[in-house]
Amino acid sequence: MAKNKFNKSWLQDHLTDPYVKMAQKEGYRARAVYKLSEIDEQDHLIKAGMTIVDLGSAPGSWSQYVRNRLTELGKSNPKIESGKPDGQIIAIDILPMEDIADVSFIQGDFREEEGLAALEALLPKSAEGKVDLVLSDMAPNLSGVGVADSARMAFLAEIALDFATAHLKPEGALLIKCFNGSGYSQIVESFKKVFKTVASRKPKASRAKSSEIFLLGKNLKPPK
């Protein structure tokens, strides 16, 4: 009975959520797009000419936003074809994702050799395979057990950080989703070891009752 009440409560929240309605109206696949857009507006993450990797991209709203943002920036560059993005977007997920124009999608696991090789084959040779921005909205399937869910989220954060450390340009940035709970402080410390600047963000589109928080790292520290 409690589960049914929870499901009904979630459905009611979902149906009345202004961000859900806005996403439907604007053609985005998920309300999560507004979390990224708010952080981008605050921190100016997305710039013309960037190569951006979207980890755990399905259903695709973050890739949609990046594509639209780079296309808007491309309007001021006469070398960019009309309606095309000024930059490169690579998305990867173990789940399928419907095509998005100008987004290179790989269905695979970047932790495994085959998936990583497919992703790296798309990286710009001119930049020695390095990228400007890595995004991760990855989240585990929730069990409802707080400690277990936090541990799974911490694992996803660490693998995103490992990927970014290996593939970012020195001035690059990483934005990931976390849970502000058990293990969060350790993730922050891991970020501080890698990035010169670390900040947390709780966008308005992130539900107040959710422990969800976003962690942003900018500018890699030189390797020791």
Swiss-Prot record:
EC id: 2.1.1.166
Enzyme superclass (EC): transferase
Binding site for S-adenosyl-L-methionine: 60, 62, 93, 109, 137
Main location: cytoplasm
An example molecular function term from Gene Ontology annotations: rRNA (uridine-2'-O-)-methyltransferase activity
Localization (cell): Cytoplasm
Reaction catalyzed: uridine(2552) in 23S rRNA + S-adenosyl-L-methionine = 2'-O-methyluridine(2552) in 23S rRNA + S-adenosyl-L-homocysteine + H(+)
Keywords: Cytoplasm, Methyltransferase, rRNA processing, S-adenosyl-L-methionine, Transferase
Cellular component GO terms, alphabetical: cytoplasm
Residues at the catalytic site: 177
Superkingdom: Bacteria
A Pfam family of this chain: FtsJ
Function summary: Specifically methylates the uridine in position 2552 of 23S rRNA at the 2'-O position of the ribose in the fully assembled 50S ribosomal subunit.
Stated family: Belongs to the class I-like SAM-binding methyltransferase superfamily. RNA methyltransferase RlmE family.
Protein name (Swiss-Prot/TrEMBL): Ribosomal RNA large subunit methyltransferase E
Species of origin: Polynucleobacter asymbioticus (strain DSM 18221 / CIP 109841 / QLW-P1DMWA-1) (Polynucleobacter necessarius subsp. asymbioticus)
